[in-house]
From Swiss-Prot:
The active site is at residues 123, 160. The gene is lexA. This is LexA repressor. One of its GO terms (molecular function) is DNA binding. PANTHER family: LEXA REPRESSOR, LEXA REPRESSOR-RELATED. InterPro entries: LexA, LexA-like, LexA/Signal_pep-like_sf, LexA_DNA-bd_dom, LexA_repressor, Peptidase_S24_LexA, Peptidase_S24_S26A/B/C, WH-like_DNA-bd_sf. Keywords: Autocatalytic cleavage, DNA damage, DNA repair, DNA replication, DNA-binding, Hydrolase, Repressor, SOS response, Transcription, Transcription regulation. It is an enzyme of class 3 (hydrolase).
């Protein structure tokens, strides 16, 4: 998570406090009222700034659609978080998705890894990404064509090789038995969750 301004830290701390006390994040109006903002729009601007700094993720269309992301996950003494099943509509680094932590140095990957994702299936086996492997992922949306990415298409998370063609994105498997996933950006929602930076073989932890 990038450093926050004092005001942004106030908003972030309020969100955490509300979730801990009530189980729900605050609405924009509640943030504005408790922190003395002139309007809910002012609260929204601070939320957008927090989202840009990867402190939170905003879920569109919900008055309480705020999720706190892992704080400095890759620097945590617990190790790299292993992300399990990702619930529809929720950010991949939401706390509830963390199955466990592995004592792996993030700096052994270039760029450094922020989290691990368990590979499900054999669509990328031809480049050595096997079912059950732990995929090391650098959280970024700055990716190039030809790179292997973790992508969310609507509510499904997948690992594929990226190719952009205008308003269409092709997500290619590395297994001839799998056809490319074609994403029409005019009607479908695509989010790049990160860049694949390495593999930990599933037998390494047995």
């Amino acid at each position: 998570m990038k450093p926050l301004t004092p005001r942004q830290q106030q908003v972030f701390d309020l969100i955490k406090s509300k979730i801990e006390d009530t189980g729900m994040p605050p609405t924009r109006a509640e943030i504005a009222r408790e922190l003395g903002f002139r309007s809910a729009n002012a609260a929204e601007e601070h939320l957008k700034a927090l989202a840009r700094k990867q402190a939170i993720e905003i879920i569109p269309g919900a008055s309480r659609g705020i999720r706190i992301l892992l704080e400095d996950a890759a620097n945590d003494d617990q190790g790299l978080p292993l992300i399990g099943q990702v619930a529809a509509g929720e950010p991949i680094l939401a706390q509830e998705h963390v199955e466990s932590h592995y004592q792996v140095d993030p700096a052994m990957f270039k760029p450094k890894a922020d989290f691990l994702l368990r590979v499900n299936g054999e669509s990328m086996k031809d480049i050595g990404i096997m079912d059950g492997d732990l995929l090391a992922v650098h959280k970024t949306q700055d990716v190039r064509d030809g790179q292997v990415v973790v992508a969310r298409v609507d509510d499904d998370v997948t690992v594929k090789r990226l190719e952009r063609k205008g308003s269409t994105v092709l997500l290619h498997a590395e297994n001839e038995e799998f056809s490319p996933i074609q994403v029409d950006l005019t009607s479908q929602h695509l989010t790049i969750e990160g860049l694949a930076v390495g593999i930990i073989r599933n037998t390494d932890w047995m």
